[in-house]
A protein has these predicted regions:
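Secretory targeting signals
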Residues: 1-30
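Hydrophobic/aromatic residues in alpha-helical transmembrane segments
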Residues: 21, 101-102, 131
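Membrane-interfacial segments
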Residues: 29, 33, 50-58, 105-113, ...
Length: 170
């Protein structure tokens, strides 16, 4: 049951992130059709960034950045039955960024342009987005995994860890 639970958790986190994109697209566009097209386009780009043919064709630094931005690379582990804290942080921050942008867009329509309240809103939304980006970047250094596969297939055993620790660095 472990891999199935991990896949459901992964699907829920993926849906949460993509719903955030959809809410932002709805807040930006005036028409439902335009919002749908914009949301699908952004989601397509987020999915495209995780595809191997695109990553392989890019220079190594850009390929790493694209892989970290793409939703597929973060969903793959959960599809195998491993819930990684870095992937959960990615999906939560993805939803948070787009929901903050949607909040700023909707509230910005009510405020008069050029007023101090609108400037504070823009600064607040920018700080929220920057904070979520930094949390996502810092979260990539956190090592927290929950291997729900039978026999913990994707976790090193204690004997393997001892052997690897004894290997000389080259």
């Amino acid at each position: 049951w472990g891999p199935i639970v991990a896949q459901y958790v992964g699907a829920a986190l993926l849906a949460l992130g993509l719903v955030g994109v959809g809410v932002w697209a709805s807040s930006v566009a005036r028409s439902q059709i335009t919002a749908f097209i914009l949301g699908v386009a952004v989601m397509f780009v987020l999915i495209l960034f995780g595809l191997d043919p695109l990553i392989v064709g890019l220079p190594p630094t850009l390929g790493t950045i694209a892989a970290n931005l793409g939703v597929l690379s973060h969903f793959q582990n959960m599809g195998r039955g491993v819930i990684d804290l870095r992937d959960a942080i990615y999906f939560l921050s993805l939803a948070g960024v787009f929901l903050a942008l949607a909040y700023g867009t909707l509230l910005g329509r009510k405020l008069a342009p050029g007023r101090a309240a609108r400037r504070r809103l823009v600064v607040g939304v920018a700080l929220a987005v920057a904070t979520l980006v930094v949390v996502n970047l810092m979260g990539s250094h956190i090592n927290g995994r929950l291997d729900l596969t039978p026999g913990h297939m994707y976790t090193l055993s204690s004997g393997t860890k001892q052997i690897v620790d004894a290997l000389p660095d080259v």
